[in-house]
């Protein structure tokens, strides 16, 4: 019995600590104008096209204290400097909701999940991924959209909406699903092990340099191979 009572305070302390770890705080921070978002740490990112610029941070209070959101040279850089973020990754995720009135580029430099909550609009919008694993789902309506990634970046990019020109350069283990994005013209270069799926109505210039395929929808009258030498194939639907 003494042993049981001896452990009880310890259990209560651990329970209190766990409850504290799971506490969620929300911070709302106005921002100066920016057109580029650079993600330098692991986050769940939700993007909103709006008429102002702000960031809302949601997560464990002790981790939020170590999150920095800084605007410099029209770029919003977001960092998480918390030392213990890899100890309990499920409890240490930070949710960012970012409103912008003119986003033109997203740089994902760390493993992140990026989603739009409404449609991003503009003349040109792009996303660049340079970390090992990324997931992004974007609704867009713009004149031109581009995507490229670096080794060893893998993951999946899903695109929906409309654009006049679509430009994709995919390498490593990346997959791009743009079937729900209607484009007039496209440049598609696939050197990845993953596939590219696109929906293009006028013409496509493509190159396959890896094992991944290009699935083409939209029945464009002009489809030009610019020098494919990979094992993947063009599959027209």
Model-derived features with residue positions:
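Generic hydrophobic alpha-helical membrane-segment signal
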Residues: 5-9, 29, 98, 160, ...
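Small/flexible residues
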Residues: 4-6, 95, 207
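Bacterial Sec-dependent N-terminal signal peptides
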Residues: 1-29
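Short, surface-exposed interaction patches in beta-rich subdomains
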Residues: 154-237
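Acidic (Asp/Glu) and glycine-rich low-complexity loops/linkers
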Residues: 18-131, 137-152, 156-170, 184, ...
């Amino acid at each position: 019995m003494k042993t049981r009572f001896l452990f009880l305070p310890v259990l209560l302390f651990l329970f209190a600590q766990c409850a504290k770890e799971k506490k969620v705080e929300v911070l709302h921070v106005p921002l100066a104008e920016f057109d580029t978002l650079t993600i330098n740490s692991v986050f769940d990112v939700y993007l909103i096209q709006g008429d102002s610029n702000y960031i809302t941070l949601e997560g464990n209070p002790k981790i939020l204290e170590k999150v920095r959101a800084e605007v410099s040279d029209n770029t919003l850089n977001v960092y998480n400097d918390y030392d213990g973020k890899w100890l309990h990754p499920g409890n240490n995720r930070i949710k960012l909701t970012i409103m912008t009135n003119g986003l033109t580029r997203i740089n994902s430099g760390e493993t992140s999940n990026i989603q739009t909550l409404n449609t991003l609009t503009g003349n040109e919008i792009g996303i660049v991924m340079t970390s090992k694993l990324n997931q992004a789902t974007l609704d867009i309506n713009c004149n031109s959209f581009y995507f490229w990634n670096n080794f060893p970046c893998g993951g999946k990019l899903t695109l929906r909406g409309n654009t006049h020109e679509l430009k994709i350069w995919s390498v490593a283990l990346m997959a791009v699903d743009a079937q729900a994005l209607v484009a007039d013209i496209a440049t598609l270069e696939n050197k990845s092990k993953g596939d590219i799926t696109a929906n293009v109505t006028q013409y496509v210039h493509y190159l396959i340099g890896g094992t991944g395929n290009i699935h083409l929808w939209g029945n464009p009258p002009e489809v030009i191979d610019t020098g494919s030498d990979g094992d993947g194939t063009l599959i027209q639907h």
